[in-house]
């Protein structure tokens, strides 16, 4: 008999939910992570009394009541509502695109005036079949919004101009004809009081966790420990990149502590011009309505990913989609291994969807 029922590779949200549920069912679990901390990319660390989102802003939002009730077992959530603002050469615009944005941009006051303005610009551009992201954006929201709020930002995000990006990246752009700055139209939204790390710690309460353990480097020995493996690392790395590497976009953060109590007045400010090298600045204290004497900010830079870098976003184009489909065949045929999570499924996953997926899989596993 092996020492554990499950070896769970990755102490992020997927691994933690799986481990919590399996332990509840009296399964013996070992969770390992190659990083020196739990919670994966939702890891928060305390600096100057402020919970800093080390791997970028994470705002919990869901329409799924069961998932909301689930996370509330492990943390109390505050009422934070994501309302980012865009800074274009010192002009401030509300996001997502709504009546506040249109009023600032054109001085329009009513939804009818805003619709007319967008229609007029779409008609003037004369685009019927958008060939690239630029044409797609203009055909959806007109020239002004595109030039000031989309062009520079999106170009920085993807590392290439909008004319070279496929139109399908923005099938739709959320445009609201109400004065509503709530970015996520979700029933439930907030940030766990005390940060995400404390929440994941509670999920892993009573579960054995070993940090700084590289599964792929010690796979042969580690596999002997458990009957089943739950793998949440990169799926292509698991198979030694034998079909080629999947592409990601990476992000680089410059984080600093400032001797001021309020740097930008909002948690998230996007810099939408092409000249500013970073895409946005996060001021972490505003996620929890902090009143600390100092503040911590993170400048976020989009970066081309190369193997060895931290993978953030899968590049969901046709080429990578086809390659992942081939890896998925290998994953499905791998005996005794469950592949899950953002990297294991090569998928852009909101947190609530990760929890849904993990609960679904562990439920079937324990049935």
For the regions a language model picked out, list residue spans one by one:
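Short, well-ordered alpha-helix to beta-strand connector turns
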Residues: 4, 26, 207, 225-227, ...
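Glycine-rich FAD pyrophosphate-binding loop
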Residues: 20-48
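Active-site/ligand-binding neighborhood in enzyme catalytic cores
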Residues: 89-93, 99-228, 232, 239
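N-terminal Rossmann-like FAD-binding beta1-loop-alpha1 element of flavoenzymes
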Residues: 4-31, 362, 366
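Mid-domain catalytic core of redox enzymes
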Residues: 215-330
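C-terminal catalytic lobe of FAD-dependent flavoproteins
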Residues: 310-367
């Amino acid at each position: 008999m092996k020492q554990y029922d499950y070896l769970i590779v990755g102490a992020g949200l997927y691994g933690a939910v799986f481990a919590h549920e399996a332990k509840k069912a009296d399964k013996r679990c070992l969770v390992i992570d190659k990083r020196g901390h739990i919670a994966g990319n939702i890891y928060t660390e305390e600096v100057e009394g402020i919970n800093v989102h080390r791997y970028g802003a994470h705002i919990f939002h869901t329409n799924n009541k069961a998932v909301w009730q689930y996370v509330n077992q492990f943390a109390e959530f505050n009422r934070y509502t994501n309302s980012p603002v865009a800074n274009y050469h010192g002009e401030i615009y509300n996001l997502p695109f709504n009546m506040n944005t249109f009023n600032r941009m054109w001085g329009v006051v009513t939804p009818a005036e805003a619709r007319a303005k967008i229609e007029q610009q779409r008609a003037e551009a004369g685009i019927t079949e958008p060939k690239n992201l630029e044409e797609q954006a203009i055909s959806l929201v007109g020239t002004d919004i595109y030039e000031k709020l989309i062009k520079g930002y999106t170009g920085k995000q993807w590392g290439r101009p909008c004319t070279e990006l496929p139109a399908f990246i923005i099938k739709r752009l959320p445009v609201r004809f109400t004065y509503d700055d709530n970015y996520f139209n979700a029933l439930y939204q907030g940030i766990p009081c005390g940060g995400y790390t404390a929440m994941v710690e509670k999920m892993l309460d009573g579960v054995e966790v070993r940090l700084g353990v590289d599964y792929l480097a010690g796979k042969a020995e580690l596999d002997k420990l458990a009957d089943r493996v739950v793998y949440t690392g990169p799926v292509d790395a698991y198979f030694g990149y034998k079909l080629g590497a999947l592409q990601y976009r990476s992000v680089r953060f410059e984080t600093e502590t400032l001797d001021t109590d309020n740097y930008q007045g909002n948690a998230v400010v996007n810099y939408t011009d092409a000249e500013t090298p970073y895409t946005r600045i996060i001021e972490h204290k505003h996620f929890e309505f902090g009143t600390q004497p100092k503040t911590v900010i993170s400048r976020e830079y989009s970066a081309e990913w190369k193997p060895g870098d931290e993978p953030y976003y899968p590049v969901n184009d046709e080429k990578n989609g086809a390659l992942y489909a081939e890896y998925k065949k290998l994953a499905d045929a791998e005996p005794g291994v469950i592949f899950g999570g953002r990297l294991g499924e090569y998928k852009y996953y909101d947190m609530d969807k990760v929890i849904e997926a993990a609960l679904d899989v562990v439920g079937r596993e324990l049935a």
